[in-house]
Amino acid sequence: MQKNNPRLFGTNGVRGVFGKEFTLDLVVDLSYSLATFFGKGPIIVGYDGRNSSPILSKIVRSVINSAGIDVGNAGLVPTPCLQYAAKRLGYNGGIMITASHNPPEYNGIKPTANDGVEISREDELKVEDIYYSKRFSKSDSFGRDFTDETIIGSYIEKVLSLVNVEKIRQRNFRVAMDIGNGAQSRVAPFLLNKLGCKIITLNGNIDGDFPGRGSEPTPENLKMLSNMVKDSKADFGVAYDGDGDRSLFCDEGGTVHWGDMVGAAIVRYLLKTKHKGAEVVCPINTTMALSLVAKETDSKVIHTKVGSVEVSREMLRRKSFIGLEENGGFMYGKLNEVRDGAMTTALVLEMLSLSDNDDDHNNKEQTLSQIISSLPKIFQYKTKFKCPTKQIANNIVTICLEHGSPKKIETLDGAKIWIDEDTWIMVRPSGTEPFVRMYAESVDGSLLNSKVAEYRRLIESRI
C-alpha cells in the first residue's frame, strides 16, 4: 500500500457515514478495486435493511458488471447467508452491503472470499493498494447480472442438518424474538418455525432507521424483550443486530446475558457432546469463563486480536469448529467459520433440548438461566467512551498501560491489564466507531467495581 494513505478497512470491512466519508465516489472506486482483486466471477452481492443499501447494491453490481464479471443478486439477506452462498453455492467471492450494528446513518462494504470468510487482513491491504493506485481491470464486455433466489432456502436446510431437529421439536419451545428491524426477519422466524417453535416477535419489520431500538443489541436496550419473555412465559428470548450475524439471549426470567457467557455455555455443550477436545478460538477480550470451561474438558482456548476476521481466519488455519466473540458473535465451523445469529439460536435450542441427557444436569431438563448459572461465576463490565480522534484513543491506551502496578500486561490488541490472576481491565480503540471500548472481569464483584471506577476516572480525564 502507498505510504501515508489512510486505511480503508476497519475491524469489519469498510464503513462510514453515507454521503459523508462513505461517498459514492468511494463506493465506485472500491467496487472497481474489488472487481480487480477477485479477477473473475461470479460474485454474489447482498445487502442489509439500511435505507441506502438497495441503491448501493445496484452501484456495486453495476461496477463489477462493467469489469466483465458476472454478479448474483442475493437481495436483502443476513450477512451469514451471503457468506454461506460465497462458500457453498459456486461463487468466487461475495460482497455484503452493511454497517452491521452501526447507527442508521452509516453503511459499509464487507468483502468475502470464496471460503465464506471475510477477506484476510493481507488481502485488505491488496485491495487498498489497488484502490489508491487506481490500477483497475477494464473489460470490453459487460458481465451478467442475475438474481439468486435459492440462497435462503439452501441456508436454512443446511442449518437444520446440523442440529437435532426431532429433539428440538419435541420440546415445543416458546421463543421471544427481537429482530431489531434488521435482516434476520428474512431467516430466523422461518428457521424456528421449522424447528417447531412458537415465536413471539418484536421489531419484526425491516426499517433502516431502526426505530424499535438501536441496531446493536445490548443488555441496556433489550428491556422490551426482557418484559416480553416474562409476559409470554417464553423459554428464552433472542435479539439480533442489523445484519443478523450476532445474537444476544435473554433467559426465561428476563435476564439478558452478554454474548460470551451464553457462548461459554454453548462451547461447554459442544465440547461435551459433538466436539470433545476441540480447540476454541476467541479474541483476547473474551470472558475468563471460557478458559475454565475448556479446562473442564481438556480443551484449549486460542486468543486472537479483536475482530471477527481475526477469529474466523484463525479457525480456518487451525481447522477449528468453534469460535466466538464477547459481543454475541458465535461461529460454528460445521456451517461456516463466521458469526451467525440464526445458527447460534439453533444451537441454543439444541442445547436446551438435550440438557436432560447430560449427566452433569442430573437427567433433568434445564432452563437457560440454570445452564448459565452453572458456569464459573464471573462479574463483567463493558462500556464505551466517545473519543474525538484516533490519536486521543491511542493516548488513552498508553496512559492505561502506564497506570498503577498491575500483575501482568498484554498488548496483543490495545491494553489488557491484569490486576491479579482473576481480575482484568482491557482498553482498546474501536475499529468501527469513534469510541474507546472498555472491558473488565473479576471473580470479585467489589474489586471489579473499584477498578472500573478507577479506570473510568482515568479515561474520562483524558477525553
Give residue ranges: language-model regions:
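Gly/Ser/Thr-rich active-site loops/lids in small-molecule metabolic enzymes
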Residues: 120, 201-203, 255-274, 341-350
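An N-terminal, well-structured beta->alpha segment
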Residues: 1-68, 93, 145-175
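Gly/Ser/Thr-enriched, mixed-charge loops and adjacent short helices
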Residues: 1-4, 17, 107-232
